[in-house]
Amino acid sequence: MKIKAPVITIDGPSGSGKGTVAGLLARKLGWCLLDSGALYRLLAFAARNHGVDLTNEEALKLLAAHLDVQFEATAAGQGQRIILEGEDVTHAIRNEQVGSGASQVASLPAVRDALLLRQRAFQEEPGLVADGRDMGTVVFPDAPLKIFLTASAEERARRRYLQLKAKGDDVSLSSLLDEICARDERDTQRAVAPLKPAHDAIQLDSTELSIEQVLERILSEIALRGIAG
């Protein structure tokens, strides 16, 4: 029987830094990267492009099964480009409206089922770093290392505010905090695959930690468990 490539999962709420940490970790290890949140953002983005209502579960399920999407590594390992139906949407799917839509469609059981096998297909040699909200609980429950990364809602809103201001966006810190709290409630209260730590996950609060400190903590766990060579 073929031994599957190892997986490290990094779950957590919006703005916890999981995407940044996962990208840095994947590059450090030379592993594949799954940004599962991007799949839900892509679905919400495609739904709006095709006039599909975000409450129409059957139509969204069909759209999810036939998403024409590619993830392409950029030069020198600087992240990835996301191509949807031939168009580079890497930045277009990162706005707050698409993020809110992603949270909506992620609460639909049929949509999650449609994307499950698609996510598991990313598990390839030499290994996979997967970030999202249910990577350790649902998608890769047998992963040898599971991280649940969090931070206070206020700190997560502050980080997002600084990101958006740096891009020149006109945003309000208070409105971002409201949106993060609303997303937290949707993600933790949904009936299917709610946001929660896996029973065997290592929980890290990054409120007062730098990205580098979080990465070092995870690398220490990898070394301790002998996961990456």
From Swiss-Prot:
Q: Which CDD domains match?
A: CMPK (cd02020)
Location in or out of the cell: Cytoplasm
Q: What is this protein called?
A: Cytidylate kinase
NCBIfam families, per the entry: cmk
Matching Pfam families: Cytidylate_kin
Q: What are the record's GO terms for cellular component?
A: cytosol
UniProt keywords (A-Z) are: ATP-binding, Cytoplasm, Kinase, Nucleotide-binding, Transferase
Q: What is its main location?
A: cytoplasm
* Gene3D superfamilies in UniProt: P-loop containing nucleotide triphosphate hydrolases (3.40.50.300)
Q: What is its EC number?
A: 2.7.4.25
Which residues does the annotation say bind ATP?
Answer: G12, P13, S14, G15, S16, G17, K18, G19, T20
Q: Which reaction does it catalyse?
A: CMP + ATP = CDP + ADP; dCMP + ATP = dCDP + ADP
Keyword Cytoplasm set for record: yes
* InterPro entries (alphabetical): Cytidylate_kin (IPR003136), Cytidylate_kinase_dom (IPR011994), P-loop_NTPase (IPR027417)
Protein's organism = Pseudomonas savastanoi pv. phaseolicola (strain 1448A / Race 6)
Q: Give the encoding gene's name.
A: cmk
Q: Does the keyword NADP apply?
A: no
Molecular-function GO term, any one: dCMP kinase activity
Disulphide bonds annotated for this chain are: none
Family as reported in the entry's similarity comment: Belongs to the cytidylate kinase family. Type 1 subfamily.
- What's the source species' lineage? Bacteria, Pseudomonadati, Pseudomonadota, Gammaproteobacteria, Pseudomonadales
